[in-house]
Amino acid sequence: MNAAVTTLVILAVMTVLFVVGTIPLGLVSMAGAILLACLGVITKADVFSAFSGGTIVLLGAMMMVGQALFHTGVADKLAEIMVKITGTTENGIILATVSVALLLSSICSGVGVVAMMLPIVIAMSMKAGVSVSRQLIPLSFAASVGCNLTLIGAASNVSTAGLIEDMGIKFLTFFELGKVGLPLCIAFLLYFLTIGKKLLTPGDTSDKAYLEEYTKREPGKKFDNVKGGICITVLICILVAMVFANSQWPMYFIAAIGCVILIATGCLSESQAMRAVDWPTLFIVGGMSAVSKAMSVSGAGKMITDFVVSMLGTSPNKMMFLAFVFLVTMLLTNMMMNTSTVVLVTPLFVPIAVAMNINPVAIGVAICIAASAPFLTPVGSGTNTLCIRPGNLGFRDFFVPGFGLSVLTMAVSLVLIPIFWPL
C-alpha cells in the first residue's frame, strides 16, 4: 500500500471515529498523526512540529486573554451592555455576535476573533438564559465566512493570490473579493436567523462544569476598574496589532506579549493562565496539522484532485469545471488546513483553466471562498476546534447546520462568480 492510499485509509478511519464520538477528538487526531509517522508517511518530527508553530501559540495565548476577560469582570460588563441592546432572544444574540465576527474576521485572524469573542458570547448567553452551545456554531462559522470580505481576511486568500500572480495573472484588489463575500455574509445571517437556527442541536449541550470553571471570578471580588481597563486596553491593542501583523510582528507574538502584560499587571495569575489553556483543543489542532502535512507529502490530496480531473474529461463545460473546483476545494479544506488546500489545488486547477480558455481569476476566487468553508467537520478549522470544549460539541453538531451552509455558500458563489468574472 503506497503512502497516499495509507493516508486516505487512516483519514477515513479517523473520520468514522469523529462521527461516532466515543473517543476524544484530541486522542483520535494525535493517534492518527503518530500512526502516519510510524508507517513512514511523515517524519516523527512532523507529528509535533505544529506545537512550536504560530497557530498553537496564538490559540493558547488567546485562551489566556479570554480568561482574563472573565476574571476581571470585563466579559460580564460587555455582555450586560450587549444584552440590553439585543434583548434576551436567541435571534438578537445571534445577529449581534455574528455581525461583529463577520466584520472583525475580514481584517483579523478568524481564530483570534473567535478566541476574543468566546468569553463575551458565553457570558451573553448565560445572562440571557439561552443555550450557550447553540451560539457557538454560528460564531465559529461567521469567522470563516467573514474572511471573504477582503483579500487579507485569511492566509489562504493571500496564498491563492500569490500563487496566481506568480503565474503572470493579475488577480484581485483588496476589496474585490467582497463582491461575493458581502452577499455571502448577508446570506449567512439570513440562514442562521431562519433555517440554520432550526438545524442547530436543540437544548444546551455545553459542558457546565467547564463553563463554571471558565467563567468564575474570585469569590466576592467586584469589577476592578483599573484591571478591567488594562484588560480592555490590551484586548484593543491586540486587535489593532493583528490588523497590521507581518512577518516581523506575527499575530502569535503579539498575543503572547498581551498575555505577559496581563499576568505582569495582576489581571491574571500564572496558575489561572495555565488553567485557561484547553489542552485537548491544542492536541486536535496539532494532530490535524500533521495529518494535513501527510495529505500533502504523500500525494493523497493530489490523488483526489487527479481523480476529479479525470472525471471531467478533456473538454468540460465551463460552469461544470467551476463547480468541480469549488466542491473539491471545499471538501479538502474540511480535511486539511485551508492554506495547505489552496497550495495543492491552485497550481493544479488554474493552469488547466488557462488551457481550457476559462477565466483563471474566476477559478481563483472559487478556490479562495471554498477554502474558507470548513463547515462539515469540527476539525476543519481552528475556529471550529475552539468551540468544541465549551459547547461540548461533536461531529453531528457541526455537520447538520454546516451541510446546509456549504450548499448555500456554493450556490451563491456559483451564481455570482460568473457575473463578476465571466468564464
State where each predicted segment sits.
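Hydrophobic transmembrane alpha-helices of multi-pass small-molecule transporters
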Residues: 1-60, 64-66, 176-306, 322, ...
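Alpha-helix capping and helix-loop boundary segments enriched in small/acidic/polar residues
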Residues: 3-4, 22, 51, 69, ...
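Hydrophobic residues within alpha-helical transmembrane segments
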Residues: 31, 99-100, 138-141, 183, ...
